[in-house]
Amino acid sequence: MYTHYLKNLVSFKSVTPNSAGAIEYIDDLLKQHSFKTEIKIFGDSKKEQVTNLYAIFGGNEPNICFVGHVDVVPAGNYEFWHNSNPFKFHEQDGKIYGRGTVDMKGAIACFLAASLNFIKNNTDFKGSISFLITSDEEGKSKHGTKEMLQYIYDQRYKIDFAVVGEPTCEKEIGDTIKIGRRGSVNFKLNIVGLAGHVAYPHKANNPLPCLIKILNELINIKLDEGTEFFQNSNLEVTNIDVDNDTSNTIPASAAAHFNIRFNSLHNVETLRQLIEQIIKQYCKEYKVDYKLEYSSSAESFIQNPNDNDKIKKFANVIERTLKIKSKFSTSGGTSDARFVKDYCSLVEFGLLSDMAHKINEYTKISDLQKLYNVYYNFLIEIL
């Protein structure tokens, strides 16, 4: 059942932010099984239009919602794929190949199968099952899950617990549950000096010594020691640019870009204050000006499993189903869980992450079966 759904989902060339028919396929499938569905298209322009779906079966609490995305990253050169078509279902040696099989059409297929079988086998269950699916997670994530959550809550829908189907597992299905994510903030620093000839440095003010001093301190700063569920926060310099191709000219300015992935001990504003304090110190010493810009796609968040019965139940289901004790993790990049956490508690749990976004992306059929079993048994446990 899940392989059938995955075969159909892979066939849609849903490169972000395009649904390419994938969400419409899910909508039609769920309608056939008596789900109440609504598709909403959000976006500032035609190029940015994003397709979103909310579908629900039942009207009672708790409402267990699967949150996912059909959009995928570009497939690259088709010639490097086994069957020269990453959007055609290809099964070989117990594996299913195709763009999005891991991230995250495989998880969508498994939760679809688990939900429909659960409803078929448990006609008198109490509660609701819902799906929130977008075509804008791999891109800007501006008009997808974030806007759709606000819309459905304006319509008075309430989600009690969400399963986000990101590929979280590392070596085997069940070994990792994501219960939070690090925050991310990007900085762009521009040091403004005074251009001049290298033979007359006293008539110029080179911005580079100041920038070098600042970056040296930033890369050596110890932001924290980490927490029970988070690794230590980390700063990485990603670009240095002086826009100067001549060797006899002192540049007028020098710029650097850097990113901080941070845990729950910080937020964007406290980090900005710390960074700016260091910058001001050196700019004063070197008598240069500066401009600091920053942007953040996510604050950090954490849900302590010790304080959340539904997260505990999810972990217990994995242990009973797969005979493996899951590790609670906050590693990796950002995901749509950063939007969901403002509305309800959640876990992120899906397939193995190793092949996500890679040429010849694949998942094992046996892993799909394991994921299906976990999803199905969790619905039994919670509803």
Curated annotation (Swiss-Prot):
Amino acids binding Zn(2+) 1: 69, 103, 166
SUPFAM superfamilies: Bacterial exopeptidase dimerisation domain, Zn-dependent exopeptidases
Residues the record lists as binding Zn(2+) 2: 103, 138, 357
Classification via CDD domains: M20_DapE_proteobac
Keyword list, A-Z: Amino-acid biosynthesis, Cobalt, Diaminopimelate biosynthesis, Hydrolase, Lysine biosynthesis, Metal-binding, Zinc
Residue ranges the record marks as coiled coil: none
Alphabetized GO MF terms: acetylornithine deacetylase activity; cobalt ion binding; succinyl-diaminopimelate desuccinylase activity; zinc ion binding
PROSITE patterns: ARGE_DAPE_CPG2_2
Active site feature: 71, 137 (proton acceptor)
Catalytic reactions of this protein: N-succinyl-(2S,6S)-2,6-diaminopimelate + H2O = (2S,6S)-2,6-diaminopimelate + succinate
Keyword tRNA-binding: no
Entry note: cofactor: Binds 2 Zn(2+) or Co(2+) ions per subunit.
Pathway: Amino-acid biosynthesis; L-lysine biosynthesis via DAP pathway; LL-2,6-diaminopimelate from (S)-tetrahydrodipicolinate (succinylase route): step 3/3
Enzyme Commission designation: 3.5.1.18
A GO biological process held by the record: L-arginine biosynthetic process
Family: Belongs to the peptidase M20A family. DapE subfamily.
The protein's assembly and partners: Homodimer.
UniProt protein name: Succinyl-diaminopimelate desuccinylase
